[in-house]
Amino acid sequence: MATSCFPPFSASSSSLCSSQFTPLLSCPRNTQICRKKRPVMASMHSENQKESNVCNRRSILFVGFSVLPLLNLRARALEGLSTDSQAQPQKEETEQTIQGSAGNPFVSLLNGLGVVGSGVLGSLYALARNEKAVSDATIESMKNKLKDKEDAFVSMKKQFESELLSEREDRNKLIRREGEERQALVNQLKSAKTTVISLGQELQNEKKLAEDLKFEIKGLQNDLMNTKEDKKKLQEELKEKLDLIQVLEEKITLLTTEIKDKEVSLRSNTSKLAEKESEVNSLSDMYQQSQDQLMNLTSEIKELKDEIQKRERELELKCVSEDNLNVQLNSLLLERDESKKELHAIQKEYSEFKSNSDEKVASDATLGEQEKRLHQLEEQLGTALSEASKNEVLIADLTREKENLRRMVDAELDNVNKLKQEIEVTQESLENSRSEVSDITVQLEQLRDLSSKLEREVSKLQMELEETRASLQRNIDETKHSSELLAAELTTTKELLKKTNEEMHTMSDELVAVSENRDSLQTELVNVYKKREHTRNELKQEKTIVRTLEEELKFLESQITREKELRKSLEDELEKATESLDEINRNVLALAEELELATSRNSSLEDEREVHRQSVSEQKQISQEAQENLEDAHSLVMKLGKERESLEKRAKKLEDEMAAAKGEILRLRSQINSVKAPVEDEEKVVAGEKEKVNVQQ
């Protein structure tokens, strides 16, 4: 591509290009970097000038590749100029001036290439400059880090050297101290040699003292064992007394709970009694109401009886009217039969009238009479129908009255059933009240028994409390005496310990004096060391024994303080027990008063119960009478119902007969109408013939 595009290039052109691009490379954008790299660049130019020419050629080729799209753009612009030559003369002039000034197209191309290459190289140079700046910054940071590490390494060296020096000094000091300690140990050995002989004699004396102390310790141990046994006995006695007190407290709590339960039961019984009184009052009210209702029912029954009598009378009158109606119906039926016979006769006469037209005039008179008779029959039928409608109205009224009476009787029966139920409820409530009163009496008897038992138990508890008080006071006196003895023994043991300590101090002083006077016994050091260790062990054992004795004494003192505290607590508990007993006595007195009140209430309740029994017996008698009256009324009502049913049957029969009569009347009317139509036609024919005869005349 490069050879085809640029064939005439030679060394002169390459020199021109190099002369044109040198100022671009020598632009003062990064003078420091150029200064740093001047010797490197000089060496490179001096070594290989051919490589620089090759680089220039390569740069020209790259610029040519980058300019190719610009040439295409210029060709497109020239095509646009050929199309718009008439509209843009000024642009052509400018192009001509540019072509005239250029003279040679290769020079213009080179200028364009130089401009484009300068832009590309400038951008590449800027990128390289930024990369160099970043690399310089990283190098400087690395140099700073290296300097810091070197400083840290130097400081570590100095610290290590100082530590080594200090360790050497410490080792020297330790060596000196060890030498001094060795010398001190040698001196101690020398002094120990002098003290060993004196220790032998002192050990013998100390053994004697230790044996004496052992005998004294054994005696003290025996005394301590005796005191421990006495203390155990006292503790057992205290436990027994505490158990007794707990048992008494439990009994007291049980008694208090029982008393509270009895109080609650008394309250509940009183509330139940109040409820029963209210129930009795309500029952008395119900009884009075039932009496009033019975009076009202008796009055209503009387009224019903009067109404029944009235209705019976009305029914008798209605039966009479029904008999009259039956008679009238029979008469109407007879008249109907006669009218039927007359109709048959009229039909026969009509047939004869047809056969005998000459006898029409005579038949007209008979027809008029028959018509009059028919009108009379129609009037009679109308009256019969009106009477039948009246009878129907009466029957409907009677049925309504019958239904009303049935409703009244049903309501009365419901009221009677309700009264029976109320009476049964009252009887059940009275029986329940009786059973509850009997239960209350049983409970009161139980309460009396419990109160007597409580009084007995309270008296027993008082006796037991007095005995426990006496025994506790004895135990307290014994514990006081034993504590005083223990305190005296403790004082004696403390004095003995002080004496032994003083003797030990004197012996130690004498041992020091003997150790200063005797320095010639070096050969017996080993034996003396053994003896000294043995004596040390014995002394340690004696010290441990003394410490145990002191600890036991402290423990005894603490036990004495505890026993004092227990004594105080027992005294407080005794005071509380006495207070609780006083409260129990008060509660017992209050319960006795409440029992007396309950007995009085029971007596009053029994009186009231007897009164209620009498009232209930009276109510039963009244209810029996009311039941008998109700049964009588029920029997009367049943009789009335049967009579009503018979009347209803009769009314139904009358209705059926009336319906049959209506049907027959309608048939008669239809027959009469059928007879009237041909008669009227014949009359019209006769009238027409008469008119014709008159016209002919």
From Swiss-Prot:
Recorded GO molecular functions are:
DNA binding
Q: Where is the composition biased (Polar residues)?
A: 616-627
Stretch forming the transit peptide: 1-41, 42-79
**PTM statement from Swiss-Prot or TrEMBL:** Phosphorylated in vitro by human casein kinase II.
Q: Where in the cell is it found?
A: Plastid, Chloroplast; Plastid, Chloroplast thylakoid membrane; Plastid, Chloroplast stroma, Chloroplast nucleoid; Nucleus
Biased amino acid composition, Basic and acidic residues: 604-615
Q: Where is this region: Disordered?
A: 81-100, 599-629
Lumenal, thylakoid side: which ranges? 80-106
GO BP term, example: starch biosynthetic process
Instruction: Give the signal peptide range.
Output: none
The text the record gives for the protein's domains is: The C-terminal part (439-697) is necessary for DNA-binding.
What does this protein do, in the record's words?
Answer: Required for the initiation of starch granules biosynthesis in leaf chloroplasts. Anchored to the thylakoid membranes with its C-terminus facing into the stroma where it is essential for localizing PTST2 and SS4 to the stromal spaces between the thylakoid membranes in order to begin starch granule formation. Associated with leaf chloroplastic nucleoids in vivo. Binds to various chloroplastic double-stranded DNA fragments without particular sequence specificity in vitro.
Query: What is this protein identified as?
Result: MAR-binding filament-like protein 1
